[in-house]
C-alpha cells in the first residue's frame, strides 16, 4: 500500500497510486462499519483534535465518528467558545494545541491556504477538512469511492459536475482527482458561476445543462454557496432551477445508468428535484455519506502509520 503523505492538504499532492491506496483501504473500512462491532485499534493511544472554523454537520460528525471507530481520543474544539473569538490568531491557537502533543489535527477554515500554513507550524499530522475555495480532499476521495463501487471503476468515465463551480472547493478537488484518474470531466454552470481559467484543467465547459449531460456516466450536483457570494450571481433561485437544477427531464440526456451525486447539504427544488434525490435507482447521495466515514478512517489510518514511522526513525536517531 502506497501513501507517502505527512499531511493530507489536498488532492493535488497525491499520485494516482496513493489515491488507489486510500480507496482500497477505505473499502475494508466500509465492511467494518457494516458490522455489529465497528471498532479498530489503528489509532489507539493517539489524540485527534477537530478544529472547525466553519459550521459543519456532515464533515465534522463523520471525522469524529471515524476517529472514535479507529480507537482515537477525539476532542472537538468549540471555536465559538475558544480564544479565537477573543482575538487569538490561528497560528497561536495551533501552537497552543501543538504544545499538548496531539497526533492528528483535522481543520476546516474559511481562508484558502490556512490549513497549509498551520501544517507548517505543528509536529502532528494535519488533515484538511476544507479551506475556503481551495480544496476538500476527503470529499473528492469519498466521491471517488462512491463512483468506483457504483460503476466498478474510477477511470475512463464521463463525469458532469454541475452548479456553483466558482465557489466550490468540492468541485476543485474532484476536478483534480478525476483528471489524475483519466476521466473526461465536464463543468456545467452559468457564466457567472464558472471561474476564469478553469479550462486549464483539461475539462469541457458548458452553460447548457442538457448538452453538458449528454452521455454522462456520473452527474455530480453542487450546492449554491450563498455565504461565499458577494453579489448577484443568479437572477433568482426559481430561474436557476429552471436552467441548472437537475430533474428527470434533464437527467434523461445522461446515460440510462448514470448515477446522481450531491455533497450536501442539498437545496431541494433549487439544485435538484427532491424526488430524484431520493430515487434509490439513480441517487447515491446516501452512499456518499456512508463512504465518507470509511474514507476518513482510511486517511487517518494512513497518516497515523506515517507519523509512527517518522517518530520511530527519530527515536532511533536519538539513541544513535
From Swiss-Prot:
The keyword NADP does not apply. One of its GO terms (molecular function) is aspartate carbamoyltransferase activity. InterPro entries: Asp/Orn_carbamoyltranf_P-bd, Asp/Orn_carbamoylTrfase, Asp/Orn_carbamoylTrfase_sf, Asp_carbamoyltransf, Asp_carbamoyltransf_Asp/Orn-bd. One of its GO terms (biological process) is amino acid metabolic process. It catalyses: carbamoyl phosphate + L-aspartate = N-carbamoyl-L-aspartate + phosphate + H(+). Belongs to the aspartate/ornithine carbamoyltransferase superfamily. ATCase family. Catalyzes the condensation of carbamoyl phosphate and aspartate to form carbamoyl aspartate and inorganic phosphate, the committed step in the de novo pyrimidine nucleotide biosynthesis pathway. This is Aspartate carbamoyltransferase catalytic subunit.
Amino acid at each position: 500500500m502506497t501513501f507517502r503523505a505527512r499531511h493530507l492538504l489536498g488532492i493535488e499532492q497525491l499520485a494516482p497510486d496513493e489515491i488507489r491506496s486510500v480507496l482500497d483501504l477505505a473499502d475494508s473500512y466500509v465492511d467494518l462499519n457494516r458490522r455489529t462491532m465497528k471498532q479498530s485499534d489503528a489509532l489507539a493511544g493517539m489524540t485527534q483534535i477537530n478544529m472547525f472554523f466553519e459550521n459543519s454537520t456532515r464533515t465534522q460528525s463523520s471525522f469524529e465518528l471515524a476517529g472514535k471507530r479507529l480507537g482515537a481520543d477525539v476532542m472537538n474544539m468549540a471555536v465559538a467558545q475558544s480564544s479565537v473569538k477573543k482575538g487569538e490568531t490561528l497560528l497561536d491557537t495551533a501552537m497552543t494545541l501543538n504544545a499538548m502533543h496531539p497526533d492528528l489535527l483535522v481543520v476546516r477554515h474559511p481562508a484558502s491556504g490556512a490549513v497549509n500554513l498551520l501544517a507548517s507550524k505543528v509536529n502532528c499530522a494535519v488533515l484538511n477538512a476544507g479551506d475556503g475555495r481551495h480544496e476538500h480532499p476527503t470529499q473528492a476521495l469519498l466521491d471517488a469511492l462512491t463512483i468506483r463501487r457504483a460503476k466498478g471503476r474510477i477511470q475512463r468515465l464521463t463525469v458532469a459536475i454541475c452548479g456553483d463551480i466558482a465557489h466550490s472547493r468540492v468541485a476543485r478537488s474532484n476536478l483534480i482527482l478525476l483528471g489524475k484518474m483519466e476521466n473526461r470531466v465536464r463543468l456545467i454552470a452559468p457564466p457567472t458561476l464558472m471561474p476564469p481559467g478553469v479550462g486549464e484543467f483539461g475539462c469541457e465547459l458548458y452553460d447548457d445543462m442538457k448538452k453538458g449531460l449528454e452521455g454522462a456516466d456520473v452527474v455530480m450536483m453542487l450546492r449554491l454557496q450563498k455565504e461565499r457570494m458577494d453579489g448577484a450571481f443568479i437572477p433568482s433561485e426559481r430561474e436557476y432551477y429552471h436552467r441548472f437544477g437537475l430533474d428527470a427531464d434533464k437527467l434523461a440526456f445522461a446515460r440510462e445508468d448514470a448515477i446522481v451525486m450531491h455533497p450536501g447539504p442539498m437545496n431541494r427544488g433549487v439544485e435538484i428535484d427532491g424526488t430524484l434525490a431520493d430515487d434509490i435507482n439513480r441517487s447515491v447521495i446516501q452512499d456518499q455519506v456512508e463512504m465518507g466515514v470509511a474514507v476518513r478512517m482510511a486517511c487517518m489510518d494512513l497518516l497515523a502509520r506515517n507519523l509512527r514511522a517518522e517518530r520511530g526513525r527519530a527515536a532511533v536517531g536519538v539513541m544513535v
